[in-house]
Amino acid sequence: MQHFEVNYDGLVGPTHNYAGLSFGNVASLANAKATSSPKHAALQGLKKMKALHDMGMKQGVLAPQERPDIFALRRLGFHGTDSEVLYRAATEAPAIFQAVCSASSMWTANAATVSPSADTANGKVHFTPANLTNKFHRSLEPQTSGRILQAMFNNGRYFEHHTHLPDNEHFGDEGAANHTRLCREYGHAGIELFVFGRYAFDSSKPAPKRFPARQTLEASQAIARLHGLSEDNTVYIQQNPDVIDQGVFHNDVIAVGNQNVLFYHEQAFTDTESKLAEIQRKFGEHPLHFIKVATEQVSIQDAVNTYLFNTQLITPPDGQMTIIAPTECQENDNVRSYLEQLTQSADSPIKRVEYFDVKQSMRNGGGPACLRLRVALNDEEIAGANQNCLMSDGLFNRLNQWVEKHYRDELAVDDLRDPALLEESRTALDELTQIMKLGSVYPFQQD
């Protein structure tokens, strides 16, 4: 039996815009109110997916969510026709209105936490959608995320789906952006690392002061229980509160892991040495590489500005571990120099770096790692999943045509109130569910 890590990238939605909604995300705030290009963003994302597919990687696609979220606005007391609801909300509560238009579901690292069958007690792949309670615009996502994931992984023999955690900050969960897995091979039992920002029930513990800690220890522990993980294959690590206050809002902005490699900044965690020792002890006697980037090599500011760690660390079929990095890393002399030294070092397990232009996503604070949800699967599980969500030459061409047909070239924040945009988006998503054989996953399809 063969085993793979499949990257499911989020397809950028038709309302991709720069509203600056994410406090604690430096890039999101810096580009607030700029004009976006939904079409360009979606095509950029598809190009990256196709490139990884062409490298021999298993690559999937995760559908976007329905926006503007008319149903959320109606729950908040805006009545009338859809056009009237849009107008009233945009006029009377513009901040709320912009939030329900967000295309943030494109960052599928926040869609869910996934545990592969090799790690779980019942031998199934487990999915728990993230509740994303810290940001209103993202807290609207988990129910639809759950329906989409169930439509993608729709065979109960292999897959088990859980309801997202309670919608409360005590159980704030940001999904795979605060979770990584170390293993020898993808099909072998691994160590799942849960990184959290604060203790929900103990205010005496360290916590950031400037920006919020979005993930709690208690949420991470709950996910591990739901997924049937054990003490022997889990490690809980607190993120350094000081780096959260410098704009590191998720662990995947300061660390990334793949197979037997953990690539991290020296300021990423609290109690680093004891936690690395715990990882090593639970990993066993097999080779394990901890690649520490010192502050004198790359500053926190450079790490955040270039998203050095919000890169994809992958193992293509040729076995040459590769970093998939945004072009911002290439454009920063210091970071580019570091990556050149890293990949040229004889004792480094990371051998290549490939640069991709994902600037439409980067301007909203999401790099290559934000755009993908990693799912370790064996060939039987892949065969048991929805085949229409796996990248191929045919799907790539079909989705490019779909984007060209339905997406706008430019979108300003003021354009979000246009009733035509809602209809354009619904028409596009209805067609997409047919292309990807998802069924009626969107609220407007169930209305």
UniProtKB/Swiss-Prot annotation:
Enzyme class: hydrolase
Molecular functions (GO terms): N-succinylarginine dihydrolase activity
Keyword check for Methyltransferase: no
Family the UniProt entry places it in: Belongs to the succinylarginine dihydrolase family.
Subunit note: Homodimer.
GO biological process, one term: arginine catabolic process to glutamate
Pathway(s) served: Amino-acid degradation; L-arginine degradation via AST pathway; L-glutamate and succinate from L-arginine: step 2/5
This protein's name: N-succinylarginine dihydrolase
List of residues binding substrate: 19-28, 110, 137-138, 214, 252, 364
Species, as recorded: Idiomarina loihiensis (strain ATCC BAA-735 / DSM 15497 / L2-TR)
Residues the record marks as active site: 174, 250, 370 (nucleophile)
Keyword Hydrolase: yes
Keywords, alphabetical: Arginine metabolism, Hydrolase
Gene3D superfamilies associated with the record: Succinylarginine dihydrolase
Known function: Catalyzes the hydrolysis of N(2)-succinylarginine into N(2)-succinylornithine, ammonia and CO(2).
EC number(s) given by UniProt: 3.5.3.23
A Pfam family it matches: AstB
Catalytic activity: N(2)-succinyl-L-arginine + 2 H2O + 2 H(+) = N(2)-succinyl-L-ornithine + 2 NH4(+) + CO2
InterPro entries membership: AstB_sf (IPR037031), SuccinylArg_d-Hdrlase_AstB (IPR007079)
